[in-house]
Structure formats: C-alpha cells, structure tokens
Amino acid sequence: MNPKSNDANDSQNGTLQKNESAKSAKEIVMEYLQLITERQDFKSARSYLKDNVSYVSPLNSFDRAEPYLKYNESLHLPKLDIKKIFVDGDDVCILHETSLPRISSTVFTTLWFHVDGGKISSLRALFDPRPFIRPQR
C-alpha cells in the first residue's frame, strides 16, 4: 500500500489493509442489515456482498449475490429485534427475533456472517422453519 494514500485498498495486491479507514466486520454487517430491512435498498445492499456470496438456511441456499438479494426482497423483512451480537475477527453472529405478520409468527434466528476483504462472503441463517411450511389455519 502506498504510505501516502488514505485508501483502504492496496491496489498492488487487492487486499484490504487494517487501518482507521477500513470498516469492521460488525459495521459492514450492521449497515447491510439496515439496508435490506429498514431501508429496503437492495441496490445499495449489493455493494456489501461478494459476487459469489454463499447463503444457506433451512429453506434456501444461494451462491450468487443477485438471486440471494432477489429472495431477500421478496421477504419484505421488518427491522430485526436484535438480542445479542458476537464478533470474532471477520465473523459476526447475530441472535434476533423477527415478527412476521404474513405468517402470524415471531421467529428466533441466528445469523452467522463472514466478511472477507470488506464484503460479506457467506451467511448462514439458522431458525425453526415450521412456521413457513405448515398450512395456514
């Protein structure tokens, strides 16, 4: 990295350098979640994801950003009621509840994000899928 540059990206080797201008994994994840829930700004959210982002949950899996974001857009996710956040380097784990009026249920979910080079490279969502698959009464 050019010592005179304030840029977080090292143009010679493409790696993100640790300095004041680099966002933490937690900051990246929290900004991304705000974009897809509160703001519903999926175009801006795309810039937080690697092209080959991996998403796995009990109901779906994706290995590219565009189909994953389209899926998220269809969910109309409300703001998350975050209970706890754990951070370990480039890994961020969020425990939250989401109230889903369309299925008359509140779902407790664990999200495990991995951030690589300043972008989200993987996300694992763990939750009980029964409210999504049982017939409506």
Question: Model-found features: residue ranges?
Answer:
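C-terminal and inter-domain tail/linker signature
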Residues: 1-137
